[in-house]
């Protein structure tokens, strides 16, 4: 397994859409990351080579695009009731818990080892170990965070840090098919797009398991990942969004390696947490414990067809909790009408001549749920 670190260009902006240009996701999901890597693979080696290696490519495992603050790596909060419900903790409100979105991997490891006492010391954690009310870090990382951002306050909850900022930009609408400006009352129709920008100390990363020993295939896959430097990620790249100064493939940092190593002491835990989007196969349904759902859709990104919508599909979000036997799946979401007789007889139907896949085999992180009786 490897980590890919993506350093944004200075003043880079990103649009990771969620069905609306005016709404921007903080996470670029693993299914979209898979699509970007596959499209880069085609640009480098052609569709014929892709088809030859399609099963190898479908079997890789990916996390979503996550954040790192220098050497502090953030992962999603587990979608377990323990991290949403309060039981007799004076001075803490339910919203204090619900606002938390991420753990550092070091804090998460301490959670696995029962060193982070979530049940009995939640007020201390919220006051001293939580950045911007949304990111829980280890006590061992507090001084580093204060040094990086010049924080003088004793309690982190009193510090205001702009890690990720949102920006709205106004654009003129263009007809996707005719490539002309859409007008209303003889004026160009305007719309808003939301972008995010990262603090200079914040970068992206994701994890990838090649799940294969074929050195030639791995070399091609890594070249496709490196091409993200030039091709970028996310929407609105035509107007300068989504680009990176550097993309590096590195070994796993120590905390990740200790948790994910094949000989890790955590491998005997019964549960796992998803670090990417999970699409259950028919045998996985019984292994789903706690989850949130995301609807995957949007338009197909292909040089042969730029205006066809994908079939929508529901998937488990990052942070969902499953049992050890969960595998995940890769689904064909090609438009349903591409094979019907009417389209076959229409020369101008803008028909795809290849399959469109969405990836749902995420990196899984061992998870140790509390033994209290939380309801589903």
From Swiss-Prot:
Q: Where is this region: Disordered?
A: 332-355
What keyword terms does UniProt attach to this protein? Antiviral defense, RNA-binding
Task: Give the UniProt record's GO annotations in the biological process aspect.
Answer: defense response to virus
Pfam families, per the entry: Csm4_C, RAMPs
Could you tell me the superkingdom of the organism this chain comes from? Archaea
**MF terms in GO:** RNA binding
Q: Which residues cross the membrane?
A: none
Comment field (misc): Encoded in a type III-A CRISPR locus.
Per the record, the similarity remark reads:
Belongs to the CRISPR-associated Csm4 family.
User: Could you give the subunit structure recorded for this chain?
Assistant: Part of the Csm effector complex that includes Cas10, Csm2, Csm3, Csm4 and Csm5. Stable Cas10/Csm1-Csm4, Csm3-Csm4 (which crystallizes as 2 heterodimers) and Cas10-Csm1-Csm3-Csm4 subcomplexes can be isolated.
What does this gene product do?
CRISPR (clustered regularly interspaced short palindromic repeat) is an adaptive immune system that provides protection against mobile genetic elements (viruses, transposable elements and conjugative plasmids). CRISPR clusters contain spacers, sequences complementary to antecedent mobile elements, and target invading nucleic acids. CRISPR clusters are transcribed and processed into CRISPR RNA (crRNA). The subunit probably binds to the 5' handle of the crRNA, helping in discrimination between self- and non-self. The Csm3-Csm4 complex binds both crRNA and a non-specific RNA; Csm4 alone also binds RNA.
User: Which named protein is this?
Assistant: CRISPR system Cms protein Csm4
Q: Which organism is it from?
A: Methanocaldococcus jannaschii (strain ATCC 43067 / DSM 2661 / JAL-1 / JCM 10045 / NBRC 100440) (Methanococcus jannaschii)
* The encoding gene: csm4
């Amino acid at each position: 397994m490897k980590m890919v670190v993506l350093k944004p260009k200075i003043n880079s902006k990103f649009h990771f859409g969620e069905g609306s240009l005016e709404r921007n996701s903080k996470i670029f999901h693993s299914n979209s990351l898979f699509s970007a890597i596959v499209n880069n693979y085609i640009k480098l080696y052609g569709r014929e080579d892709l088809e030859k290696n399609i099963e190898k490519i479908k079997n890789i495992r990916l996390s979503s695009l996550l954040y790192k603050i220098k050497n502090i790596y953030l992962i999603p909060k587990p979608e377990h009731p323990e991290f949403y419900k309060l039981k007799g903790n004076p001075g803490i409100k339910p919203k204090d818990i619900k606002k938390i979105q991420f753990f550092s991997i070091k804090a998460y490891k301490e959670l696995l080892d029962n060193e982070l006492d979530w049940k009995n010391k939640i007020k201390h954690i919220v006051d001293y170990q939580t950045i911007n009310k949304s990111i829980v870090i280890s006590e061992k990382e507090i001084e580093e965070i204060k040094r990086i951002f010049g924080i003088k306050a004793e309690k982190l909850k009193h510090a205001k840090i702009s890690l990720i900022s949102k920006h709205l930009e106004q654009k003129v609408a263009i007809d996707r098919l005719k490539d002309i400006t859409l007008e209303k009352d003889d004026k160009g129709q305007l719309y808003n797009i939301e972008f995010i920008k990262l603090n200079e100390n914040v970068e992206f990363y994701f994890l990838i398991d090649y799940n294969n020993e074929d050195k030639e295939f791995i070399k091609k896959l890594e070249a496709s990942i490196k091409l993200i430097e030039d091709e970028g990620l996310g929407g609105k790249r035509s107007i300068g969004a989504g680009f990176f100064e550097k993309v590096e493939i590195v070994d796993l940092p120590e905390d990740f390696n200790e948790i994910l190593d094949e000989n890790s002491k955590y491998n005997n835990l019964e549960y796992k947490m998803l670090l990417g989007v999970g699409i259950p196969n028919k045998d996985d349904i019984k292994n789903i414990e706690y989850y949130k759902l995301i609807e995957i859709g949007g338009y197909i990104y292909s040089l042969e067809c730029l205006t066809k919508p994908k079939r929508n599909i529901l998937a488990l979000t990052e942070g969902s909790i499953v049992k050890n036997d969960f595998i995940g799946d890769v689904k064909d979401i090609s438009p349903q009408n591409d094979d019907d007789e009417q389209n076959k007889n229409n020369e101008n139907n803008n028909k795809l001549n290849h399959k469109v896949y969405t990836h749902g085999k995420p990196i899984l992180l061992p998870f140790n749920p509390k033994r209290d009786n939380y309801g589903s």
